[in-house]
């Protein structure tokens, strides 16, 4: 297999779904473009209605949560449900901590540089203390915290929603994925479409809490229901012409979801795009299409991995350009934003990888004082 071919097509050694990894990057780029809107006029903002791009990540996370539960069931774990739930959330949260700590430091530095003249000493202290709530994932609980990085709400909302959903899904099994999850998803999505809060403001407070947290519950439940659909779909054989047709439907469907982010501002349309995204994710995970065959190379998986640092660190460039207020054409500021976001994300990922390797080779040792 040539090196060029290996970038896109592998020998199947990687167990991850390459199409999903590619889509992680695509929807992450959609979020990055959405957040560049502060540089543009209202009419020319890129993907200005793309707030529902985050729902893709929620849906995938819901699917993978049920997949983890199925593995736990087959392993016949003997730990209590509470401990198992905590272990699952720890497995989700701990790998994110280096990223959250680093972006927290970036945020403190940038905000302090640009707003320190307007803060008293006591204000600076309160600013730091309340910002810790964001680092600890408490932002979407309703606690008023100092927001240093606007896009981190997604992680807080996901962990909060998973805390009750995981034990419910583990305890109830198919009753959850086939009945409770889809019912909860459609009712919450219907409620979101009727409430006054907009998707563009996930921190907006509603009668059910932050709208972002409600979105997390809805989309995670939708992802749980997707798992049930995939299970049912995989039980049947399919002919080549049908697989080819579904491959076209898959790619066209995702193109429609992305294109709608630019043109459809009505919340009802956004809700329908969330349903379409869930259907497409089910199609992608089902393996019916041929996409996985030519989306399984090293480049695809590298893009999937890079989506995490890009999502977390790109907001730093948005804040920087907002504060600097450069007297430059919009196109140049946009180029600086994109280039800076890529550079900061790549550099931060390199720093985190270096620290992980360093601490692996030089683990911290706690000295037992009783032996001294």
Question: Which residue stretches match the model-derived regions?
Answer:
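Short juxtamembrane and helix-loop transition motifs at transmembrane-helix boundaries
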Residues: 110-120, 137-147, 200-205, 229-241, ...
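Alpha-helical transmembrane segments of multi-pass integral membrane proteins
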Residues: 220, 224, 247-357
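Residue-level recognition of alpha-helix termini/interfacial anchor residues
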Residues: 176, 216, 229, 238-241, ...
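Interfacial loop-to-helix transition and helix-capping segments at the boundaries
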Residues: 17-18, 42-54, 143-157, 194-222, ...
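Membrane-cytosol interface segments of multi-pass membrane proteins
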Residues: 1-195, 301, 306-309, 324-372
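Structural signal for the C-terminal ends of transmembrane alpha-helices
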Residues: 65-74, 112-113, 167-173, 224-235, ...
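Signature aromatic-anchored transmembrane alpha helix within multi-pass, membrane-resident enzymes
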Residues: 180-187, 239-257
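Localized chelating/binding microdomains
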Residues: 129, 133, 217, 221-224
């Amino acid at each position: 297999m040539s090196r060029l071919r290996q970038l896109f097509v592998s020998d199947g050694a990687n167990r991850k779904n390459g199409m999903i990894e590619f889509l992680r990057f695509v929807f992450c780029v959609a979020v990055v473009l959405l957040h560049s809107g502060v540089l543009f006029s209202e009419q020319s903002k890129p993907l200005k209605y793309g707030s529902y791009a985050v729902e893709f990540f929620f849906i995938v996370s819901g699917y993978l949560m049920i997949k983890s539960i199925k593995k736990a069931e087959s392993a016949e774990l003997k730990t209590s449900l509470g401990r198992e739930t905590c272990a699952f959330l720890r497995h989700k949260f701990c790998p994110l901590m280096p990223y959250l700590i680093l972006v927290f430091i970036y945020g403190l530095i940038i905000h302090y540089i640009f707003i320190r003249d307007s803060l008293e000493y006591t204000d600076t202290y309160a600013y730091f203390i309340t910002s810790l709530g964001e680092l600890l994932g408490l932002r979407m609980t309703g606690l008023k915290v100092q927001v240093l990085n606007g896009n981190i709400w997604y992680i807080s909302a996901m962990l909060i929603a998973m805390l009750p959903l995981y034990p419910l899904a583990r305890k109830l099994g198919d009753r959850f994925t086939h009945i409770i999850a889809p019912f909860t998803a459609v009712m919450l999505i219907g409620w979101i479409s009727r409430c006054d809060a907009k998707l563009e403001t996930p921190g907006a407070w509603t009668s059910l809490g932050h709208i972002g947290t409600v979105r997390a519950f809805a989309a995670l439940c939708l992802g749980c229901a997707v798992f049930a659909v995939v299970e049912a779909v995989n039980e049947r054989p399919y002919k080549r012409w049908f697989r080819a047709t579904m491959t076209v439907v898959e790619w066209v469907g995702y193109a429609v979801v992305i294109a709608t982010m630019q043109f459809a501002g009505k919340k009802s349309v956004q809700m329908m795009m969330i349903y379409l995204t869930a259907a497409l994710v089910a199609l992608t995970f089902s393996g019916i299409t041929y996409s996985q065959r030519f989306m399984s190379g090293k480049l695809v998986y590298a893009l999937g991995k890079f989506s995490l640092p890009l999502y977390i660190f790109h907001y730093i460039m948005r804040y920087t350009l907002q504060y600097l207020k450069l007297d430059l054409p919009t196109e140049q500021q946009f180029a600086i934003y994109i280039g800076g976001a890529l550079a900061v994300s790549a550099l931060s990922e390199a720093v985190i990888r270096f620290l992980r390797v360093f601490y692996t080779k030089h683990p911290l040792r706690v000295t037992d004082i009783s032996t001294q």
